[in-house]
Amino acid sequence: MSKPLPSALNPLAKALLIRHSLRPRHALSRIGMGLALSSALVFQVQAQEWTLDIPAQSMNSALQALAKQTDTQLLYSPEDIGGLRSSALKGRHDLQSSLRILLQGTGLRYQIDGNTVTVTASAAAKDGQIELSATNVNSAGLGETTEGTGSYTTRVTSTATKMNLSIRETPQTITVVTRQRMDDQHLGSMNEVLTQTPGITMSQDGGERFNIYSRGSAINIYQFDGVTTYQDNQTRNMPSTLMDVGLYDRIEIVRGATGLMTGAGDPSAVVNVIRKRPTREFKSHIQAGVGSWDYYRAEADVSGPLTDDGRVRGRFFAAKQDNHTFMDWYTQDRDVLYGVVEADVTDTTVARFGIDRQTYKVNGAPGVPIIYTNGQPTNFSRSTSSDARWGYDDYTTTNYTFGLEQQLAHDWQFKLAAAYMDVDRDSFSSYYSTTTNRSYLELDGSTEISAGIVTAKQHQKGVDATLQGPFQLLGQTHELIVGYNYLEYENKHRGDSGPDVNINFYDWDNQTPKPGDDEIIPGIQYNISNRQSGYFVASRFNLTDDLHLILGARASNYRFDYALWRIGNEPAPYKMVERGVVTPYAGIVYDLTNEQSVYASYTDIFKPQNNVDITGKPLDPEVGKNYELGWKGEFLEGRLNANIALYMVKRDNLAESTNEVVPDSGGLIASRAVDGAETKGVDVELSGEVLPGWNVFTGYSHTRTEDADGKRLTPQLPMDTFRFWNTYRLPGEWEKLTLGGGVNWNSKSTLNFARYNSHVTQDDYFVTSLMARYRINESLAATLNVNNIFDKKYYAGMAGSYGHYGAPRNATVTLRYDF
């Protein structure tokens, strides 16, 4: 136990009192006072710069390393830093910027007095000191947590390798959408966030069924706080793309193959969603918004200590949203609840338990028929919808999460995370029939409307455990991580139908009789069970001060059970088991300067798939290789990140639609396996603070996927995308005003209909948006967002025989009060 100190003393006096009154060696041992002393005092230490290399580790070891490498005297108390972990520090820095980076996000503050630095924990900043709470991070020292930083980038990310590396140190393309950017752009759902990311595109098959693509493949792996979940793109039970993002701190997107950490999956991307965590100091806000089409939203977020000593902390978030839309008879209703408790079980152990529940209820359905039976494209009003007024589609998603972080000796760390997800879907709609490569709409408007009833239950369990830390070899410090993760996914999906109704689509006014229980026709049952587990090991070898090599491998076991049958018939189950599948990973990073690096990486691809052939049998696993090389820059002490990447993906057994319906499948489209498929592309991105007060996020992406004969695959997706968004806080007497705006551009996309020797093309288009925020006082701010200011009409996504219009010009006003 540390000796209590008079609370009236300032941090420097407190530290010096400890130093002088507890000078005997045995007393220092008994008290556990952390004291790092230099052998000589150096004057003007604040102005001096050093080339530093301090990996992320326990705060005690990081401060000792800083004292040694800068020849500086550091004073601190173990009870202030117990259980805390530093950020990584690398490059050339002065003492002040070094402290800001190491201490960011910890609630610690520092005071420099000549060659002596005192580090303490405190509830409030005082004269001559800088407060670095978990939600008030000085922009010169960013860390993982983005909330409260005002930044469009982050200093540390672990999604790609599970190691705490900067974006520049990671040999893959990483995009981070921070809390500030989500607030500035008024991004409310996961699909809104992802479609604002360069290289990410969308198709929509009707209703609330989003397919999100990256590098030519659908994204089907989503992580929540690093625990992997699976999204089935066949049954379209896709809760991950519909999630409200109000409870998240940031969203990290690692593009390309990530099999080392996630196991089976496409070489598209992994989306890691990081929830907000409790803060050591009280903070809260309430927020209300109104907007176009009767948009109303209210939310509250409260966080802080639950005990006097702050060792137990909690956070609660709630949101309610109701809105109509630009489409007739189509409304949305969201309810979000999130609670989490975090505790310092010991000075080196942190445990966390949280629950979040989201309900998403929709009346009606978006989308319009995109082509007539004669092959002529349609041109409906954006207000047109294709569902009866009584149609609905309801999702309820509940997540239970647990986390444990244990600091070990010699700067090693053990982490354990577990999650359970439960999803219920209930849908009853009357929809315009959609089938790939076929239209059911005559030129005179006559067509059939079919009632569809879907019930689905999805359960997922996930565990992720890692042990990591530094080790010495050949005079250099290296990082090693070993781990295990497990995923169990079950999805039971039943689809029934009602009698077809003949209507005229031009004047049906979205009204048809709702089928009674005695009119329901049994349809199909579709069950999937997917279990995978794997052990992985990876190491970051610092071969020289400038050359870093990451080598890793994963050994995985898979079991995939699949059954599709018409109700009343006997199921025909299919099972695939793979054991000991090895996925290698290699990445190399060379530091050109303290701010710029070049890199190259390689990994294997393995993905069991539920795309089926004409007999209903799943295709063999997709296999391949992923190559990437690029350049990265980290400027202005990490406040600005830039990257350029070139990539190539080679795959066999890639599923391609045959446009044929599998017999007795309820409309399931058959696929064929394509060998020799190749995807090539480039990603360019810039994010962060370009100048004081000026935040920018921009990026360009090009991708093209071809089969072995050079034929382009997925032409319904744009090959090129450009995203730009920026905000500027005005200086001087206008400092209360922040202005922002941006533009999204997608290149041409084409949906082909071979049956009619026809196609539907969406030409390239721009969508422009603006925002303005005025800070009324220190606590209250008002924000105006205007989207699609030029009211561009365009298809945001095309699939099957449906098109989905992007929203017309719209506006929201949000009022936020921070306590």
Curated annotation (Swiss-Prot):
Question: For this UniProt entry, which residues form the secretion signal?
Answer: 1-47
Keywords in UniProt for this one?
Answer: Cell outer membrane, Ion transport, Iron, Iron transport, Membrane, Receptor, Signal, TonB box, Transmembrane, Transmembrane beta strand, Transport
A GO molecular-function annotation: siderophore uptake transmembrane transporter activity
Report the Gene3D superfamilies cross-referenced here. Answer: 3.55.50.30, TonB-dependent receptor, beta-barrel domain, TonB-dependent receptor, plug domain
> Where, per UniProt, does this protein localize?
Cell outer membrane
Quote the PROSITE patterns the UniProt record gives.
TONB_DEPENDENT_REC_1, TONB_DEPENDENT_REC_2, TONB_DEPENDENT_REC_3
Q: Which domain of life is it from?
A: Bacteria
This protein is called Ferric-pyoverdine 358 receptor
Question: Gene name, please?
Answer: pupA
InterPro entries (alphabetical): Plug_dom, Plug_dom_sf, Secretin/TonB_short_N, TonB-dep_rcpt-like, TonB-dep_rcpt_b-brl, TonB_box_CS, TonB_rcpt_b-brl_sf, TonB_rcpt_CS
Matches recorded under Pfam families: Plug, STN, TonB_dep_Rec_b-barrel
Q: Which NCBIfam families match?
A: TonB-siderophor
What is the protein's known function?
Answer: Specific receptor for the siderophore ferric pyoverdine (pseudobactin) 358.
Q: Where is this motif: TonB box?
A: 115-122
Name all TBDR beta-barrel domain ranges.
Answer: 281-819
* Topology term for the membrane: Multi-pass membrane protein
Can you quote a single GO CC term?
Answer: cell outer membrane
Q: SMART domains attached here?
A: STN
